[in-house]
Amino acid sequence: MKDSFLFTSESVTEGHPDKMADQISDAVLDYIIERDQKAKVACETLVSNGFCMITGELKTSVYAPMQEIAREVVKKIGYTDALYGFDYRSAAVLNGVGEQSPDINQGVDREDGEIGAGDQGLMFGYACKETETLMPLPIHLAHQLTFALAQKRKDNTLPFLRPDGKSQVSVRYENNKPVSIDTIVISTQHSPEVSQKHLKEAVIEEIVYKVLSKEYLHDNIKFFVNPTGKFVIGGPQGDAGLTGRKIIVDTYGGSCPHGGGAFSGKDPSKVDRSAAYAARYVAKNLVASGVCDKATVQLAYAIGVIEPVSIYVNTHNTSKYSSAELEKCVKSVFKLTPKGIIESLDLLRPIYSLTSAYGHFGRELEEFTWEKTNKAEEIKAFFKR
C-alpha cells in the first residue's frame, strides 16, 4: 500500500509588504557593509499606508542615507503610483535607528580576533533530493510562481498585474517522494479593469504552464486564482509589512523546523543569519556527497561564545551512518564558529539584497556561497578513512 500525503508551501512576491520591509532592511545592510566590513547592523523596517519606518541598531562609521535607500528599493519593486498602494516618491520615510548596545558588542568583538556569537539561538539547515538544487519541491515551485508573477509584470506580458502577490503549492507524495501537484493557489494584485476570468486564464497559461516543470503538471490540478474575486487594494495600503515575518518563505517552506530567527537586516555576526546559511551549507554537502538522501542540521550558539554549543544531524533514516558519526564528520570538515562561517562563506560582501526575496536557499547564484557543494569530496574522504 502506498503511503500518500499532501504537503504545502507558500511564497510571496517582492511587492508583498513583509518582503518590501525585508528588502529595505537588506539594502541598508548592503550599503553599510560595502563601506565598513566591521559594521554591526540590525535593521528593522515597517511599511504601512503611505509611510516607511526604519529602526534598529548600528555600530558603524558610515552614514547611510536611509530615505534614498528605501525609496530606491520601493521604486525597483514597482510601487511607482499611489494607485498601486504605495508610491516611492510621496511616501514618508522615518529614521529611528540607534546605536548598538556596548553590552552586546563586548561579547562579539574579541581582542584575540575571534568573533563571539551575536546572540544565543538555534538554527536549522535542510537538503533533500527532490530537486536539482537539493530543495523541497513545494517551496521550489512556489518560488518559481511568485518570481514569474513579478517578471511577467515587469516585462509587460501581463500589464494588469501589480506588485503584491502570493502563491501556494500542494504537492502529492507517495512513499515520501513527490509525484504530482495537487493544488495551486495564486493571489495577485491587479488593475481594476481586468476581469476575473481573463486574469485566471492568463495566470494559468502564462505563468503556471510556462514556468513549472511538465513532470508534475496534469489536467486535474485544482486552481484557485484570486479566490476572493478581487485584489485591487494591495501593498502597504492593504496590509502593513514588517521585516522578518516571512521566515518560512525565506527557508524551506515548512519542510524542516525553524529556530525562529529572521535574516534580513542582520550582518553576519548575527548567527540567526550566518549560522542558518552554514547549516544549509552543511546539509547540502552531506546530501551531495551521497552519505544521505535527506539531512536536517541544527546548530546552536550562546551569546559571546565562539564555538557552537551543539551540532545535531538527522538524516531521516536515509544514511548508513549514525548521527554521532555524521556530527563528527561535520565538526572535522566545516568551520562553524562565527568567524569560521564568515570567512569560509565570504559573508562580508554586499550580497544580501539578492537574498531578500524568493528564498535564501536553493538559488545557485554565484554570490550564494552556502549553495556550493565544494565540501562533498571531503565528506566522502572522511568516511573512507
From Swiss-Prot:
It is found in: Cytoplasm. Homotetramer; dimer of dimers. NCBIfam families: metK. K(+) binds at E44. SUPFAM superfamilies: S-adenosylmethionine synthetase. It holds the Pfam family S-AdoMet_synt_N. Catalyzes the formation of S-adenosylmethionine (AdoMet) from methionine and ATP. The overall synthetic reaction is composed of two sequential steps, AdoMet formation and the subsequent tripolyphosphate hydrolysis which occurs prior to release of AdoMet from the enzyme. Its main location: cytoplasm. Gene3D superfamilies: 3.30.300.10. Keywords: ATP-binding, Cytoplasm, Magnesium, Metal-binding, Nucleotide-binding, One-carbon metabolism, Potassium, Transferase. InterPro entries: ADOMET_SYNTHASE_CS, S-AdoMet_synt_C, S-AdoMet_synt_central, S-AdoMet_synt_N, S-AdoMet_synthetase, S-AdoMet_synthetase_sfam. Pathway: Amino-acid biosynthesis; S-adenosyl-L-methionine biosynthesis; S-adenosyl-L-methionine from L-methionine: step 1/1. One of its GO terms (molecular function) is ATP binding. This is S-adenosylmethionine synthase. Mg(2+) binds at D18. Its EC number is 2.5.1.6.
